[in-house]
Amino acid sequence: MNDAYKTYVPVVGRLLLALMFILSGFGKLGNIEGTAAFIAGGGLPAPTFLAVAVGALELFGGLALVVGYQVRLAGLALGLFTVAASVVFHAFWSAPAEQQYVAQLLFMKNISVAGGMLLISALGAGPLSIDARIAAGTGTRFKPALAGNA
């Protein structure tokens, strides 16, 4: 693969994955009451606290992906959160028959996004990122072919 591909594709991938989290985070933080009611409906404790915490995680984790800062941590946190949220809120296996199809689609979409987040946590941000600049400043060279140093 050429260098342009290794340079720009990680940025595009981070932006596409981040978009869902940023918009969802803004939505949750802009409607704490509604988000808390939804969370309470899932049977979770402290719904208002969780609404704020989840909204902040999605917003700031998504922004971290956009700029390429601490993407390993952001990817891991967002990936684990997405799996947990999918199991709690899109449990198609226990949904009424008329809701199973949509719940399964949402579950599988979220699990796929979680897979992308876990890949980011393993592979890093790529060369066009704050993480790569920090690594370069500490004497560690980012090698796109290895994709493991940023």
Each model region followed by its residue ranges:
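Extended, low-polarity transmembrane helix blocks
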Residues: M1-G30, A40, P47-A56, F60, ...
